[in-house]
Amino acid sequence: MANDYLFTSESVSEGHPDKVADQISDAILDAILAQDKYSRVAAETLCNTGLVVLAGEITTTANVDYIQVARNTIKRIGYDNTDYGIDYRGCAVLVAYDKQSPDIAQGVDRAHDNNLDQGAGDQGLMFGYACEETPELMPLPIHLSHRLVERQANLRRDGRLPWLRPDAKSQVTVRYVDGKPHSIDTVVLSTQHSPDIDLGTLREAVIEEVIKPTLPADLIKGDIKFLVNPTGRFVIGGPQGDCGLTGRKIIVDTYGGAAPHGGGAFSGKDPSKVDRSAAYAGRYVAKNIVAAGLASRCLIQVSYAIGVAQPTSVMVNTFGTGRVSDAVITRLVQEHFDLRPKGIIQMLDLLRPIYEKSAAYGHFGREEPEFTWESTDKALALAEAAGTEPVAALAE
């Protein structure tokens, strides 16, 4: 890769139609896990103008009012007016859940005991990543993209910019020099708005109130290109503007394209699904490796076969930044982390109703108390085993 290059990531707000679907799916998952933590859940959501469809496979003893959970989620996001294209009070909600296939269940239904040989819920490959670009050990472009749409939502909620509406998208382009962030090149922010705000006022307010307070001062060098609502009017948005589906924002959910993705979405899936739990474990492993000072950049790949507990492969790539070899780090991963599905569930305490919060603004790089996969509690042990110095601010 060239020494001087641009890299871009995007994010979307909680009111984006695909994120509405993700949040409904995870709200339903949480409601089920709150009553029956051993449930099998694959909750998919479709949302369109005035309509929500709930489908998938659920096996549980929980008694959940799925329709009310969906309405409550839509209300929390801010779709409380028919002018917005969907209103939590009047939208139709259709429910079409089946039970998990017994052919799948036979390989994963050993979860009620302490048997660590619970098989993976499906085959697949998952990635985890961490780097030193931010204190959260996340790539800078996706981190800033998340913070922009998060701030848009906060300003909408507290009434400082009352003409904002729930749907929004952000995109940040960062200039890298010698592999490190040098400056911010371009910021794109498109936000849904009420029809009575003129474009000039909107653009000035978004730049001054949303964008500039979010950008790190040390990365503002020269003129930044600000593109706010570049097509102009953005009144029709949310599920009215586009049909939303669970699992369509998997790059937004992870590393913004800075690392590979195995293809499996997260939202609506209980932790027996390694699409979710193993990706969380991959982040946990990679973050602890970087926090331990073993490398300044780390990518983990794990893979599984359905019904089999042990990963079929574990790969570590530190892109030449390792203080010890990738082979040594791989051995340390196998010694310090149990990457069997049940081992991951126990290690990260995943059988809890913690997932709705993860369904907007990124599953990674957020220091929420529920997000155990963001802990660096193994950094000191890894550093001691490898003979490196941990990152002081991150090793717990």
From Swiss-Prot:
It comes from Paraburkholderia xenovorans (strain LB400). Pathway: Amino-acid biosynthesis; S-adenosyl-L-methionine biosynthesis; S-adenosyl-L-methionine from L-methionine: step 1/1. Mg(2+) binds at residue 18. L-methionine binds at residues 57, 100, 242, 273. ATP binds at residues 16, 167-169, 233-234, 242, 248-249, 265, 269. Transmembrane segments: none annotated. Its main location: cytoplasm. Belongs to the AdoMet synthase family. The keyword Magnesium applies. Residues 100-110 are annotated as: Flexible loop. This is S-adenosylmethionine synthase. The gene is metK. GO terms for biological process: one-carbon metabolic process; S-adenosylmethionine biosynthetic process. K(+) binds at residue 44. It comes from the Bacteria. It is found in: Cytoplasm. InterPro entries: ADOMET_SYNTHASE_CS, S-AdoMet_synt_C, S-AdoMet_synt_central, S-AdoMet_synt_N, S-AdoMet_synthetase, S-AdoMet_synthetase_sfam. Binds 2 divalent ions per subunit. Catalyzes the formation of S-adenosylmethionine (AdoMet) from methionine and ATP. The overall synthetic reaction is composed of two sequential steps, AdoMet formation and the subsequent tripolyphosphate hydrolysis which occurs prior to release of AdoMet from the enzyme. The keyword Magnesium applies. One of its GO terms (molecular function) is methionine adenosyltransferase activity. Signal peptide: none annotated. It catalyses: L-methionine + ATP + H2O = S-adenosyl-L-methionine + phosphate + diphosphate. GO terms for cellular component: cytoplasm. Its cofactor is Mg(2+); K(+). Homotetramer; dimer of dimers. Keywords: ATP-binding, Cytoplasm, Magnesium, Metal-binding, Nucleotide-binding, One-carbon metabolism, Potassium, Transferase.
